Regions:
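Canonical Rossmann dinucleotide-binding motif of NAD(H)/NADP(H)-dependent dehydrogenases/reductases
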Residues: 6-44
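Conserved mid-core segment of classical short-chain dehydrogenase/reductases
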Residues: 102-120, 164-167
Length: 307
């Protein structure tokens, strides 16, 4: 685990950068929109919530900020968001997939009607929506000489079990899977992919449990704290002469950032380093050989081709 501390000097690297953010009207997304905009970025954000989005526009003024009504579960809607940003500015440099939902009602409740199909909104928004965002982001970032950055939004539930929230847990594990599945390919194309995993954050999601949580003295993030980690991910590779944020190891890609009590910690590198302990040394050694085999240029999953 490595503590990450923002280097304010790197914020200047955001000046004139074009940033696309999903779920930018409220909560963490709104804080991310604000932080990027305050540091000179041109921000195009999407959301289904029109009224809060208009409030964001009013608070930040009319320059370098645009809202595009967008439903993350719709591929066509996300395409429109990105196409609008590219049409406005001619490029896209940074993408933050922040849109997310949570349903506190358990689909495994013994009192639930088994004949009623359960809602999969969390899967559709959090996982499939993030896949859509990442896919379209790759298309546009490939057009840049220096690639770009994709920042995904998971949760502590993306790597830690929590009772009752099964679809939400599944969806956020899926977002971590997007990072792990994409970052190696993206790195070859100069594109960095990272994922932020906050613990309890003061947003609409925790209204029902906030009082008891705080009374017990448990840590709470503010949405601005999580937005700061998004910005760290988006700027860690943009410093001159190898300069980066305190604790960041370059190249900063394929990282998982745990956010607790307002502070960010990179945990993916340590997870990988400890693999021989939790998987077993021999298993880890054989797995590494298999991964090397699958990384060969001639390797293919296509059943009609031979690797």
């Amino acid at each position: 685990m490595t503590h990450l501390v923002l280097d304010q000097a790197l914020l200047s690297s955001l000046n004139d950068k074009v940033v696309v953010i999903t779920g930018g009207a409220t909560g963490i997304g709104r804080s991310a929109v604000t932080l990027f905009h305050q540091n000179g970025a041109k921000v195009v954000f999407g959301d289904i919530a029109d009224e809060p989005a208009q409030e964001v526009l009013s608070s930040l003024g009319q320059e370098r900020i645009h809202f595009v009504p967008s439903d993350t579960t719709s591929y066509a809607s996300q395409l429109n968001l990105f196409r609008t940003a590219h049409s406005l500015y001619g490029r896209i440099d940074i993408v933050a997939a922040v849109a997310g939902v949570a349903n506190p009602k358990s689909i495994f409740d013994p009192e639930a009607d088994i004949n009623e199909e359960p809602s999969m909104l969390e899967i559709n928004v959090n996982t499939i929506g993030s896949l859509y965002t990442a896919r379209i982001a790759m298309h546009y970032l490939r057009q840049n000489k220096d690639g770009g950055d994709i920042v995904l939004m998971s949760s502590i539930i993306g790597f830690k079990e929590t009772q009752d929230l099964v679809p939400y847990t599944t969806s956020k594990h899926g977002v971590v899977g997007i990072m792990r599945g994409l970052h190696l390919q993206a790195h070859k194309e100069g594109i960095r992919v990272n994922v932020v995993c906050p613990w309890v954050t003061r947003t609409r999601m925790i209204v029902g449990m906030q009082k008891g949580w705080i009374e017990n003295g448990f840590p709470v993030n503010e949405s601005e704290d999580v937005a700061r980690q998004i910005v760290i991910c988006a700027t860690a590779n943009r410093g001159a002469n190898g300069a980066t944020h305190t604790g960041a190891k370059l190249p900063f890609s394929g990282k998982m950032i745990y956010v607790s009590g307002g502070e960010g910690y990179e945990i993916e590198d340590e997870h990988k380093a400890l693999e021989p302990q939790w998987l077993g040394e021999e298993n880890s050694r054989v797995l590494a050989r298999g991964q090397e085999f699958m990384a060969r240029p001639e390797f293919s999953w296509d059943p009609d081709r031979s690797s």
